[in-house]
From Swiss-Prot:
It comes from Penicillium shearii. Transmembrane segments: none annotated. This is Short-chain dehydrogenase/reductase esdpF. The lineage of its organism: Eukaryota, Fungi, Dikarya, Ascomycota, Pezizomycotina. Keywords: NADP, Oxidoreductase. The active site is at S136, Y150, K154. Shearone derivatives produced by this cluster are interesting candidates for Alzheimer's disease (AD) therapy since they moderately inhibit aggregation of amyloid beta 42 (Abeta42). Pathway: Secondary metabolite biosynthesis; terpenoid biosynthesis. GO terms for biological process: secondary metabolite biosynthetic process. InterPro entries: NAD(P)-bd_dom_sf, Sc_DH/Rdtase_CS, SDR_fam, SDR_superfamily_enzyme. Short-chain dehydrogenase/reductase; part of the cluster that mediates the biosynthesis of shearones, diterpenoid pyrones (DPs) which are structurally diverse meroterpenoids consisting of a diterpene linked by a pyrone, and which may exhibit a range of bioactivities.
């Protein structure tokens, strides 16, 4: 039996990277998936009766409610929420940070997952089961990975994950976070290179390079590697795991 057989899964950020890999993996494991992204449906997501693609801006005030209602309308329930969608900053230190990038990072990386959890939790409580997987980052436990806005948003998301895990364990609802580090994805494609804080980047490069150089293939972590862990935490095979911060970073978390 497939690990997500008959489960209804919401995946945000599903048009590329980790979200796309997770959407494909969930379908392969028997799930019915509501795939959400601000971008249009990618051509590689073929027509599938178990898939519904919903184009949506997560920063819209009604986004969380709209996504939840769409999932209930199409699939009749919600078993799993996977909060993948995220943006990065320009590696800005606090002295070069703009209000816009701070507010944008918080809106997408923290506010959107929190609001979606708020919407789905009553449904999960009523059915006495559910699994939530949030995508944090190596930056959620370190100050030497990205800029201050991204770092703060991912630290905060880990705190939210732990709080939800503890508060709703009596309802048989689990909440965990994946903490990727050095993943090949499109998250950096929208960065304005002219706004990058290169002085900050210079302090981080030696650490990042050391992570890559001791891999036999010199490759970054693949989106599929992260998706495999997400599927495990979404499934009943991890029924006693809640409140975990799981690093997928080739050992980066050890330094």
């Amino acid at each position: 039996m497939a690990t997500l057989e008959a489960k209804v899964v919401i995946v945000t950020g599903s048009a590329s990277g980790i979200g796309l890999a997770t959407t494909k993996a969930a379908l392969k494991e028997g799930a019915r998936v509501l795939a959400v992204d601000i971008s249009p449906r990618p051509s590689c997501l073929e027509d599938d009766p178990e898939l519904d693609f919903f184009q949506c801006d997560l920063t819209s005030p009604s986004a969380a409610a709209d996504i939840t209602q769409r999932c209930l309308m199409v699939f009749g329930g919600i078993n799993v929420l996977v909060n993948v969608a995220g943006i990065i900053d320009h590696c800005s230190s606090v002295d070069t940070l703009t209000d816009d990038i701070w507010e944008r990072c918080m809106a997408v990386n923290l506010n959107a997952p929190v609001k979606l959890m708020r919407e789905v939790l009553p449904i999960m409580k009523k059915q006495k089961s559910g699994s939530i997987v949030n995508i944090s980052s190596k930056a959620g436990s370190s100050g030497a990975v990205s800029g201050v806005a991204y770092t703060a948003s991912k630290h905060a998301l880990q705190g939210v994950t732990k709080n939800v895990a503890w508060r709703f364990k009596a309802d048989n609802i689990r909440c965990n976070a994946i903490c990727p580090g050095g993943v090949t994805s499109a998250i950096s494609s929208n960065i304005d290179s002219s706004a990058i804080d290169f002085a900050a980047v210079e302090t981080m490069l030696p650490i990042i390079d050391s992570v890559k150089v001791n891999r036999p293939d010199f490759e970054l972590v693949r989106a599929e590697d992260v998706a495999n862990a997400i599927i495990f935490l979404a499934s009943d095979k991890s029924s006693r795991i809640s409140g975990a911060m799981l690093p997928i970073d080739d050992g980066w978390s050890t330094i």
